[in-house]
């Protein structure tokens, strides 16, 4: 039977440890950690994600500040808000909820976030430090994936790892993080020739293509570990209902794989948990608190 990498269960376990960590250090810091989330526009999925982050913060004692801006707001106004939050001593982390309306210069906004408060790890300073394998904020989804693998003692070093997707949010930082952990990494994308053949070489296959049910049994070798980053809402056979699926056609591959992540309940919860970890890391650094935070992770 294949091993389910249960991100929801692991995230709750880590949250409990984080809650205890905050409680034991709050008297020294004299305040709770603070996370500012900037949402622009009315994208429904963004609303759900921001709500999930707000609830997660509340569960463990992080104070969240939600800034929901209309899509009529100007670039300069968003930049000014970020500058204000950069200097706000009650804010440890700043997150720009993506995607944002196309009229905005997304990278310029991300670049204006103080690297020490860039809890999404997307500022070029943090990306540069990742390239150099120096300590810095790490992107949440890649960090969540690595902790999921570690939680089940799945070795990265020396393994052939194929990543499908080259986004700045997942594919690129994840490939660098795996490389820094001595994995043998191949990054693939929409122009890769014979994609399923390349993927069949993988000991660990990570699907972050953003394409529903792309990965079937022809992509997977016996005994592989498969991580599904995708999440899509599709119409079910009953037209009035929808169902969630990932980039992996799970029912087609499950008999071949050693371990897999479900959708939902796999990578998603761990992404939110690593956002909490990054926020607390920034809080810890500001107040010179106990450096045992890494001991709370797998």
UniProtKB/Swiss-Prot annotation:
Sorted UniProt keywords: Amino-acid biosynthesis, Histidine biosynthesis, Hydrolase, Methionine biosynthesis, Multifunctional enzyme, NADP, One-carbon metabolism, Oxidoreductase, Purine biosynthesis
Pathway: One-carbon metabolism; tetrahydrofolate interconversion
Coiled coil location: none
Residues noted as binding NADP(+) in the record, renumbered to the chain: 165-167, 190, 231
Enzyme Commission number(s) from the entry: 1.5.1.5, 3.5.4.9
Domain of life the protein comes from: Bacteria
InterPro entries per UniProt: Aminoacid_DH-like_N_sf, NAD(P)-bd_dom_sf, THF_DH/CycHdrlase, THF_DH/CycHdrlase_cat_dom, THF_DH/CycHdrlase_CS, THF_DH/CycHdrlase_NAD-bd_dom
MF terms in GO: methenyltetrahydrofolate cyclohydrolase activity; methylenetetrahydrofolate dehydrogenase (NADP+) activity
Catalysis: reaction(s): (6R)-5,10-methylene-5,6,7,8-tetrahydrofolate + NADP(+) = (6R)-5,10-methenyltetrahydrofolate + NADPH; (6R)-5,10-methenyltetrahydrofolate + H2O = (6R)-10-formyltetrahydrofolate + H(+)
A Gene Ontology cellular-component term: cytosol
Example GO BP: tetrahydrofolate interconversion
Keyword Hydrolase listed: yes
Function noted in UniProt: Catalyzes the oxidation of 5,10-methylenetetrahydrofolate to 5,10-methenyltetrahydrofolate and then the hydrolysis of 5,10-methenyltetrahydrofolate to 10-formyltetrahydrofolate.
Assembly and binders: Homodimer.
Protein's name according to its UniProt entry: Bifunctional protein FolD
Organism listed in the record: Prochlorococcus marinus (strain MIT 9215)
């Amino acid at each position: 039977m294949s091993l389910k990498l249960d991100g929801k269960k692991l995230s709750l376990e880590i949250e409990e440890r984080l809650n205890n960590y905050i409680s034991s250090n709050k008297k020294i810091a004299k305040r709770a950690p603070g996370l500012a989330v900037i949402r622009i526009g009315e994208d429904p999925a963004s609303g759900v994600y921001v709500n999930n982050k707000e609830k997660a913060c509340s569960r463990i004692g992080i104070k969240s500040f939600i800034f929901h801006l209309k899509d009529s707001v100007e670039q300069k106004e968003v930049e000014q808000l970020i500058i204000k939050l950069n200097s706000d001593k009650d804010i440890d982390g700043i997150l720009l909820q993506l995607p944002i309306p196309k009229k905005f210069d997304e990278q310029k906004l991300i670049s204006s976030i103080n690297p020490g408060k860039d809890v999404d790890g997307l500022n070029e300073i943090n990306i540069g430090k990742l390239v150099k394998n120096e300590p810095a904020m790490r992107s949440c989804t890649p960090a969540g994936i690595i902790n999921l693998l570690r939680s089940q003692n799945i070795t990265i070093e020396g393994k052939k790892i194929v990543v499908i997707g080259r986004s700045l949010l997942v594919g690129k930082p994840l490939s660098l993080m795996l490389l820094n952990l001595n994995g043998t990494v191949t990054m693939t994308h929409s122009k890769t020739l014979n994609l399923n053949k390349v993927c069949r070489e993988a000991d660990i296959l990570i699907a972050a293509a953003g394409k529903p049910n792309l990965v079937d049994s022809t992509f997977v070798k016996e005994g592989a570990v498969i991580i599904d980053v995708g999440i899509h809402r599709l119409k079910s056979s009953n037209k009035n209902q929808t169902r969630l699926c990932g980039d992996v056609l799970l029912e087609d591959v499950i008999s071949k794989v050693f371990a897999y992540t479900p959708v939902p309940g796999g990578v998603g919860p761990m992404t939110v948990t690593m956002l909490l970890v990054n926020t607390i890391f920034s809080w810890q650094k500001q107040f010179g608190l106990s450096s045992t935070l890494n001991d709370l992770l797998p």
